[in-house]
Amino acid sequence: MQLNNSKRQMVLGGVAVLAAVAGAGLSQKKQAANLSMEAEQALWNAEFDTPDGRVLKMQNLQGKSLVINFWATWCAPCVEEMPLLDVFFRQNAAKGWQMVGLAIDQPSRVRQYLSQNAISYPIGFAGMSGTDLGRLLGNEQGGLPFTVVLDGKGGLIQRKLGKLSAQEIQAWA
């Protein structure tokens, strides 16, 4: 009986150690899911001109679930995923989801692209400052497309460099 009790204590001790390690891992994951103070300030203070002559103020989107997609007209994967992002936006805008496309491109090319492709979500002309913002949000290589998904509290849900699949996009909702 003593041997069984000893084994039980070892098993319980092992479970306790595993739980502690898992808890520490979750804690680190939560911390990693928060944006740096510099990134938060840069994001919420950013303003971008839009194709229709307005100003897109990122602070107006704070407090809502938000998809930020960095793209360019010359980036084939970017333009391939835009219809998928548009479908997600149209299906989920009424549920409180916001989406912004930040174009790392020349405004004339963006206007031309948008005149030929219906996109429902707001587009901002980010230019090279958009590349800097993308780097602050985790796109160290500066590649496109780059997408960041934030919850309503500004916590990071997903960050992806590269083309999104329909399954990845639908998993956000």
Short names for language-model regions:
Residues M1-N45:
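N-terminal targeting signals for export/organelle localization
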Residues N45-L66:
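A short beta-strand-turn-helix
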Residues A46, F70-W71, Y113, Y121:
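Conserved hydrophobic/aromatic "anchor" residues
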Residues L61-K64, A94, S120, G142:
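Active-site acidic short loop of glycosyltransferases
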Residues N69-C75, I104:
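Aromatic-flanked redox-active Cys/Sec active sites in thiol-based oxidoreductases
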Residues E80-A118, M128-R135:
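Structural microenvironment flanking redox-active thiols in thiol-disulfide oxidoreductases
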Residues Q116-I119, G127-W172:
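Thiol/disulfide oxidoreductase modules built on the thioredoxin-like
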